[in-house]
């Protein structure tokens, strides 16, 4: 049975188009027997990394309660990744980048010695055998252009921790009129339908 982790990152709640698309994917894959866990980073926000927490994530003695809490949370998030075969990331574009909610998650799971390590030839990811699917929504048309900082960034981060099998589903032009929005959502759903579990 495939184990799937879905990460929602929108701050828009029930109005979120990226969340609606991964909910659609959830329905499709659940009906095929996938075991799915959803973590809503917009609804249950993670702490923003600061100097104290960054120091605490390196471990050591005499950590504060706040550092211990962040370290335990980071361990939990990393364990979630390791426990699932496929990671689905719902990533709306906000001002050409990812939501802060998703950046907070990345800052808690990208840990030297835990999800990647440094060698004489550079960094090596430690998360092996995983697949990631990015479901990205945006108001304009940015795919493949210089204004898309979402997909290149997420692909880089995922590859850095060892997840190089990455697929992307785009829903674009969602604020460029009703017809364009309908087309964007329809094309994204067709792409979801075409993905194998």
UniProtKB/Swiss-Prot annotation:
EC number: 1.6.5.-, 1.7.1.17
Region forming the signal peptide: none
Single annotated GO MF: oxidoreductase activity, acting on NAD(P)H, quinone or similar compound as acceptor
Cofactor(s) this protein requires: FMN
Catalysed reaction equations from the record: 2 a quinone + NADH + H(+) = 2 a 1,4-benzosemiquinone + NAD(+); N,N-dimethyl-1,4-phenylenediamine + anthranilate + 2 NAD(+) = 2-(4-dimethylaminophenyl)diazenylbenzoate + 2 NADH + 2 H(+)
Keyword terms: Flavoprotein, FMN, NAD, Oxidoreductase
Residues reported to bind FMN: 10, 16-18, 93-96, 137-140
Cofactor note (record): Binds 1 FMN per subunit.
Enzyme class: oxidoreductase
Cross-referenced Pfam families: Flavodoxin_2
Similarity annotation: Belongs to the azoreductase type 1 family.
Quaternary state and interactors: Homodimer.
Purpose: Quinone reductase that provides resistance to thiol-specific stress caused by electrophilic quinones. Also exhibits azoreductase activity. Catalyzes the reductive cleavage of the azo bond in aromatic azo compounds to the corresponding amines.
Record's protein name: FMN-dependent NADH:quinone oxidoreductase
Gene it is expressed from: azoR
């Amino acid at each position: 049975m495939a184990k799937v982790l879905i990460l929602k990152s929108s701050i828009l709640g029930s109005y979120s188009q990226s969340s609606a698309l991964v909910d659609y994917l959830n329905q499709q894959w659940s009906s095929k027997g996938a075991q799915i866990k959803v973590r809503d980073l917009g609804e249950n926000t993670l702490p923003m990394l600061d100097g104290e927490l960054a120091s605490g994530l390196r471990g050591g003695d005499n950590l504060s309660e706040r550092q211990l809490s962040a370290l335990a949370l980071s361990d939990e998030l990393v364990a979630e990744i390791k426990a699932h075969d496929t990671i689905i990331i719902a990533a709306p574009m906000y001002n050409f980048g990812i939501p802060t909610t998703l950046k907070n998650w990345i800052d808690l799971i990208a840990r030297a010695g835990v999800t990647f390590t440094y060698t004489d030839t550079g960094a090596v990811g430690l998360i092996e055998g995983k697949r990631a699917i990015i479901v990205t929504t945006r108001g304009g048309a940015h795919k493949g252009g210089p204004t898309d900082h979402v997909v290149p960034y997420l692909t880089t981060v995922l590859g850095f921790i060892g997840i190089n099998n990455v697929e992307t589903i785009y829903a674009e032009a969602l604020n460029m009129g009703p017809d364009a929005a309908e087309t964007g959502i329809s094309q994204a759903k067709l792409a979801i339908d075409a993905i194998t579990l």
